[in-house]
Amino acid sequence: MRLLWVCVCWVPCLAAADWPQWRGPDRSNVSKETGLLQEWPADGPPVRWQASGLGLGISPVSVAAGRVYTVGNRDGAEYAFALDAATGAKVWATRLGATVAENSLMRWLTQRSPTVDGERVYTLTANGELFCLRAADGQKLWQKNYATDFPTRRPWGYCDYPMVDGDRLICTPFSINGMIVAFNKFNGEVVWTTLGEGEGPAGYGATVMSTAGGIPQYVFLFRNQLMGVAAEDGRVLWQHLRVDLRYGGTYTPLVQDLRIFSPNGYGGGMAMFKLTACGDEFVAEQEYHEPFNFDAFQDSTVLVGDHVYTFGPGGKPACIELGSGKVLWEKETAHGTKRAALTYAGDRLYLRHINGVVSLAEVSPAGYTEKGSFKIPLHEPSMGVTFPVVAAGRLWIRDNDRLFCYDIRAGGTGGGPVPPQDVLLTLTAEELAAEGSAAGPIRQGRDRAPDAIFIPTPDDVVERMLGMADVKPGELVYDLGSGDGRIVIAAAKKHGARAVGYEIDPRLVELSRKKVAEQQLDRLVTIEHEDVFTLDLSKADVITVFLYPALMERLKPQLQKLKPGTRIVSHQFEFPGVPAKQAVTVESKEDNESHRLFLWTAPLPARKPAPQEAPR
């Protein structure tokens, strides 16, 4: 059977190597790249560059016309970034608006990769603001607001994947005022709107284009309904109630001729529907429904021929026969527990596991054969997983604040090893102060949104950090971003130190204060509800920190004022451009992960020169 994913208006104007939107040019999550490595070296493919400073988030990259686009949360705001694909240097950064305070676990699981269409870039904030940016310099051309124009229940923030079709931008606010809306892509005017019905939270899946039955249409999940609407005017062509669709679908339907495969997480299983033409409309009949425990958050499916490759329970790769829904195999690997994401290119499956392992596999209905793996350097734990992207002979892997570019071409560079570049993305005063639609200049103070989610440091790593700092009785320890208070409690309880934890999240402040009181450490330990970037740190003897490189960079003015001899220990990340006095790797028995620790002593040594950024 022929795979029918139609992007007629896009394909002629795209370079073969581009990946300009969520799940690629045709939203199949299958790259058309050729000439790629079929097996990786023992330590993985070579890194061409890595860039840090994107901020918190797991949005995948979009690649088009020699640039890489993504979005992230840093300095109290959401930013859209454009980087030079060859070097990782920043081309521009545009502040979209203030970071919204949502559920601390869920807010970073939405993908929201930008959509690139020639001279324009379209992106959505978690607050529901849709922007059209100029690709050349990030200038805002127009914007809309889902929250005011198409309100709906969004318990975990907004997530949409704008799709360009000719001169229209197709968006899914998933509101009863507009479950799907066609905007004029040039000026943002509404062309048509399809009204929704029913109550309940909106979904988080993407829309795909199809020409099933010779009628151009958009296929998507709306609440508990799978449906198709006409591309011409948004009229509903068909719909089917999926009573097993739970918590809002996160998966993109897979379309093959007149058949539509609909997966869903939370135990919703998988269903196949067949469309039958009835005049200028269709009837959708369910052919089968089979149980399968797809990942609840990740849209990890690819359709290759007549088989679907995805992840099953525990992050195990799996193969499903499309025609019957039969699970042909599930593979137990050494890498995956919990969550994972995948893509397909050059007859290989690329898998990105939540523990930071990236692997390459040859897959077929007969089985799964691994062809190499590596672990992301200094992997940053996260509640979600960013999708790998294969484009322009490169594998793009985002790890929260950082983006890695790997060369996966079969021929390599042809000129021998190339030293990888390490780029720190800094923001200009203009970029920091630029007004977003939701707020003015960057906020400071304890009432703003956190810069990072709380990820507990294992207790055995905590003890190694304090030992590395040589904490002595009576010394003053500051923990910046103290979370549940475990570091300051350990410093007092095991080392006899006085300790202050600074935390911006009021819920964590309350939690850690209770823990301090329960252990009767009130005389030695204090928990302060503060913004660490506003503090005077000069009295500390020891400082512990677990922050992204861009946030470490913001601490620089405060750290330069430390008294001589103050020890600074960082978990996982180096202070950008400043060589550490000592660096160690700790193998934690608590989480079975490797953790990097770095030590500096004040005054800090001179910075290493940073790579130059591309001109704007």
Spans of features found by a protein language model:
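Conserved SAM-binding loop of SAM-dependent methyltransferases across substrates and taxa
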Residues: 486-496
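Class I SAM-dependent transferase core
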Residues: 428-472
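S-adenosyl-L-methionine
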Residues: 505-539
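Conserved class I S-adenosyl-L-methionine
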Residues: 474-483
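A short SAM/SAH-binding and catalytic strip from SAM-dependent methyltransferases
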Residues: 538-554
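C-terminal substrate-binding/active-site "lid" region of AdoMet-derived donor-dependent transferases
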Residues: 550-609
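Noncatalytic, solvent-exposed loop/strand surfaces
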Residues: 16-433
